[in-house]
Regions:
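A structural signal for isolated positions on well-ordered beta-strands in alpha/beta enzyme cores
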Residues: 84-86, 130, 147
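Substrate-recognition element of Asp-dependent hydrolases with the DxDx(T/V) motif
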Residues: 63-67, 72-101, 105
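Non-catalytic pre-domain segments flanking phosphatase-related domains
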Residues: 1-6, 178-184
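Acidic, Mg2+-coordinating phosphoryl-transfer loop and its flanking beta/alpha structural elements
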Residues: 132-167
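Active-site neighborhood of HAD-like aspartate-dependent phosphohydrolases
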Residues: 1-52
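Membrane-proximal envelope and lipid/glycan-remodeling enzymes
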Residues: 86-97, 156-167, 171-183
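Substrate-recognition "cap/lid" segment bordering the active-site pocket of phosphatases
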Residues: 88-141
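Short, basic/glycine-rich phosphate-binding loops at helix/coil junctions
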Residues: 44-59, 83-86
């Protein structure tokens, strides 16, 4: 059975929406995802706000209240009947996110067993056939087929197979299944 690794933040969990909500509330701003086309929030926030940006991520509740990216649950559950699904998240970048991320996955993706959660510091350790991720640097180091999941910060990035939403992910893997059946 082929293996798909899936990033959590900005692919399954809407981390950016929560980060923007807290940023806008704390600084009385109205930054939108449109303002971030080709950039990350860290790139547009003034230097004197960088520590607070990090503090938002370090908040105990941050990773527990994230919205689910539309269609991710249904598509991943469907894919799990034909592929081995692993969730790979760089939780070590925000160490106190491990518990909240675990609980979030249990609550929203209970069909994926905890033995298929990979909490890591670098995704270069992953060995799978596919990786769905919003960070180009993770796909560059990946030895299988990388799929760049669209997010405001990566809209100008080229050189990867791009998927804009979970319905495009479903279509991509439907073609993979169809091609593998045709090859038999």
């Amino acid at each position: 059975m082929q293996r798909i690794c899936v990033d959590m933040d900005e692919v399954m969990a809407d981390t950016l929406a929560e980060h923007l909500r807290r940023y806008n509330q704390a600084f009385d701003e109205d930054v939108t995802t449109d303002d971030l086309a080709g950039k990350g929030l860290w790139e547009i926030a003034p230097l004197d706000r960088q520590a607070q940006l990090r503090a938002f991520l370090d908040a105990e509740d941050f990773f527990e209240v994230l919205d689910v990216i539309p269609d991710s649950q249904q598509v991943l559950e469907s894919l799990s009947t034909r592929f081995e699904i692993f969730i790979a998240t760089q939780a070590m970048v925000v160490p106190n996110s491990l518990g909240p991320k675990y609980r979030w996955l249990q609550r929203h993706f209970s069909f994926i067993p905890p033995t298929h959660y990979v909490f890591c510091g670098t995704k270069s350790i992953l060995r799978a056939d596919y990786l769905i991720d919003d960070q180009p640097r993770n796909l560059t180091r990946f030895e299988g087929q990388g799929l760049l999941y669209s997010a405001p910060h990566n809209l100008e990035v080229t050189g990867f197979v791009r998927v804009n939403d979970w319905l495009e992910v479903a279509d991509y893997f439907a073609r993979v299944v169809s091609e593998s059946k045709a090859a038999i």
